[in-house]
Curated annotation (Swiss-Prot):
It is found in: Cytoplasm. This is Acetylornithine deacetylase. The gene is argE. It comes from the Bacteria. Signal peptide: none annotated. The lineage of its organism: Bacteria, Pseudomonadati, Pseudomonadota, Gammaproteobacteria, Enterobacterales. GO terms for biological process: L-arginine biosynthetic process. It is an enzyme of class 3 (hydrolase). Homodimer.
Length: 389
């Protein structure tokens, strides 16, 4: 028997009031268990079958998979997957003028941490499906709530690697202002570490200056940057080639001492189609002259787990379906989402309420003008992909 859910705004309020920050810093990182349990209770009240999945190698993080419209054995074919992440970024208390964990309505906007990015999306889903009749679904509806999108994307990675589900289509409800997104660049971030040999600067030959070796390495990487710009091109992107950025460098401790260690932090944002393995090979090849000349003194280490580029082809029939429903052409963006991993399960678009411009900002908000169009859109998606009788 179905239980009655709270009104939409109260669902939203409860989600925002349940902290679920993910951060590389363990002092800031929080479990999302309370939020997952909250969602699990609500979806169970609506008659969904609910599965909570611990995510390995995390600090007590969980995914949730809720499903309805499957057969008695919990099986189904095709259907729709609506996905989103349960975590938020940390907040800067000094820059917020409101309590981040209290939903505040002002000037037709809802303020709070996660209102746009993107805990609020689950309130939209729950509100849209509260009256769903499972007996009228000919294909299943799945809801996926993941962990740690803002850091390692561990939840989406784990789900994609272990699920047997194969829905017809997935929507990730990141804030796109309800414009469908079909592609984005990937992201890799590496530390280039040089180990030299310290010594007195009066006799440079008695040491190995790590800064000199880093200079050689950066020269090689800049040549690779040019190669990437010349070899890879996608005119759909505002910046139509892979980018490489040198973001942080540190080395040495005194002007009169040969530098023993130097470290560079850099990132590359590859286009869809440029695989992570290809990119690693290009990096290794670019730095090989330095490695050969100075054996054992150069290393490349990941700063964060890499994210591949993502693309759903423009001619995929699902793209046409969504464009027709919305009357909007699909777009490409420069930020990253869980789409490369969900795309391993089924064709995927990124589409949700709110603006990316409010994500990761003090006084994060979502414009209430998105409420009715989003509710209507989710209903249309369920009708189309789950084929209500």
């Amino acid at each position: 028997m179905k239980m009655k859910l709270p009104p939409f705004i109260e669902l939203y309020r409860a989600l925002i009031a349940t902290p679920s920050i993910s951060a590389a810093d363990s002092a800031l990182d929080q479990s999302n268990e309370a939020l997952i349990n909250l969602l699990a209770g609500w979806f169970a009240d609506l008659g969904f079958r609910v599965e909570i999945q611990p995510v390995p190698d995390t600090r007590h993080k969980f995914n949730l998979l809720a499903s309805i419209g499957e057969n008695e054995n919990g099986e189904g074919h095709g259907g729709l997957l609506l996905a989103g992440h349960t975590d938020t970024v940390p907040y800067d208390e000094g820059r917020w003028t409101r309590d981040p964990f209290t939903l505040t309505e002002h000037d037709h906007k809802l303020y709070g941490l996660g209102t746009a990015d993107m805990k609020g999306f689950f309130a939209f889903i729950l509100d849209a499906v509260r009256d769903i009749d499972a007996s009228k679904l000919t294909k299943p509806l799945y809801i996926l709530a993941t962990a740690d999108e803002e850091t390692t994307m561990a939840g989406a990675r784990y789900f994609a690697a272990n699920t047997q589900l194969r829905p017809d289509f997935a929507i990730i409800g990141e804030p796109t202002s309800l414009q469908p997104v079909r592609a984005h660049k990937g992201h890799i971030s590496n530390a280039i570490r040089i180990t030299g040999q310290s010594g007195h600067s009066s006799d440079p030959a008695r040491g190995v200056n790590a800064i000199d070796l880093m200079h050689e390495s950066i020269t090689q990487l800049m040549a690779l940057r040019t190669t990437l710009q010349e070899r890879y091109h996608n005119p759909a992107f505002t910046i139509p080639y892979p980018t490489m950025n040198f973001g942080h460098i540190n080395g040495g401790d005194a002007a009169n001492r040969i530098c023993a260690c130097c470290e560079l932090h850099m990132d590359i944002r590859p286009l869809p189609g440029l695989t992570l393995s290809d990119l690693n090979e290009l990096m290794t090849e670019a730095l090989e002259p330095v490695s050969q000349r100075w054996p054992g003194r150069l290393s490349i280490d990941e700063l964060h787990p890499p994210i591949p580029g993502y693309e759903c082809p423009t001619d995929h029939h699902m793209v046409g379906v969504i464009e027709k429903l919305l009357g909007e052409r699909t777009a490409v963006v420069n930020y990253c989402t869980e789409a490369p991993f969900i795309q391993q399960v089924c064709p995927t678009l990124v589409l949700g309420p709110g603006s990316i411009n409010q994500a990761h900002q003090p006084d994060e908000f979502i414009d209430m003008a998105f409420i009715e169009p989003t509710r209507e859109l989710i209903g249309q998606l369920v009708d189309h992909f789950c084929q209500q009788k």
